[in-house]
Amino acid sequence: MTLAIDMVGTNLGSGTKTYNINFCEYLNKRNLNERIYIFITETYKEEINDKKNKNITYIIKSKFLANIFFRIIWMQFFLPFELIKLKVSRLSSPMNFSPVILKFFNIKLILALHSNLPWVFFKQMSGNLLRNYFTKFIMEISIFVCDKLIVDSKFAKDEIVNL
């Protein structure tokens, strides 16, 4: 079973960027038994201390995908077909949302949700109101279509169960 990980994210100094880079560096040091494709932006690739791991293939995406709008378009309409082409059987999406049509392609989805801000403190989300509602909407759909959901706390789990 081939795994892909969608680590395409913001270029801004943030917890998301730090998480993505550290996660990639962690995987680079592991003795892996299966092939993993990791989708990242050019900026992340420049910052990853790339210890050549024969089982990891980085698929470098343009810096313009650091923009949330373009990232969602790519994720929903292009990423699923890239996964099919690579014969991926599982996608790990650790950035709160994922392609919602993967079920149609028989690709298992592992979603990691590291923010429950849209349900608990919606008004404290950064960005404009329309973007925040759209983000919350995509996150909710991703939760409903995923095969496995990973949350970072019991509090977050309790909030998600109530959706």
Task: Describe each PLM feature range.
Residues 1-163:
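Carbohydrate transferase catalytic cores enriched for Leloir-type hexosyltransferases
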